[in-house]
Structures are given as C-alpha cells and as structure tokens.
C-alpha cells in the first residue's frame, strides 16, 4: 500500500532536439560538389553561382571551388557562391 499522496502534473518536461543549423563552410574555404555550405530555416542566405538550394533551404556546392559570401541588390541580400579554384 502506497504511503505517498498523488503528485500533481506539470506542463513542462519537453524539449526539441538540436537542429545543427548555421554556416558549415566559411568564405575562402575549398569545397567539392555536394558539400553542404549553410543549413538554415528560410533564406537567410541565397544561392549564387555554383550553389544549389535543397527543399529545406540548405545551400550546397554544385561544383568544386572556393566559397565566397557577398551582398547584392537593392535589399542587400546575402549570397553564397562557389568560384572555380
């Protein structure tokens, strides 16, 4: 027979797993085709020349080369490109 009163419930006790987002390869570093450059939610960075975008907005290298980050356009969007080495 239990000699402890029933405890109240709580609305806490949950936490989501880390998503490991962010820049994986920085400007000036070498990449080969298929390397992930940026993992992101939404288009914080846009795909430039030599860079593709996955359906979860992940940017990846389409060609071998060197990563370059720059801002362009009226809205100062940040672009990631891969230049041939």
UniProtKB/Swiss-Prot annotation:
Domain of life according to the entry: Bacteria
InterPro entries: Ribosomal_bL27, Ribosomal_bL27_CS
Keyword Flavoprotein: no
Gene Ontology MF term list: structural constituent of ribosome
Record key words, sorted: Ribonucleoprotein, Ribosomal protein
Nucleotidyltransferase keyword on record: no
Location of region: Disordered: 1-20
Endpoints of the signal sequence: none
GO cellular component: cytosolic large ribosomal subunit
GO biological process, one term: translation
Family membership: Belongs to the bacterial ribosomal protein bL27 family.
Name this polypeptide is given: Large ribosomal subunit protein bL27
Source organism of this protein record: Psychrobacter sp. (strain PRwf-1)
């Amino acid at each position: 027979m239990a000699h402890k009163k029933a405890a109240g419930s709580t609305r806490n006790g949950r936490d989501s797993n880390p998503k490991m987002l962010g820049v994986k390869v920085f400007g000036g570093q070498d990449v080969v085709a298929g390397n992930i450059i940026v993992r992101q939610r939404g288009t914080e960075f846009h795909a430039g020349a030599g860079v593709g975008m996955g359906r979860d907005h992940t940017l990846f290298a389409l060609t071998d080369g060197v990563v370059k980050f720059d801002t362009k356009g009226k809205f100062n969007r940040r672009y990631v490109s891969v230049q041939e080495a």
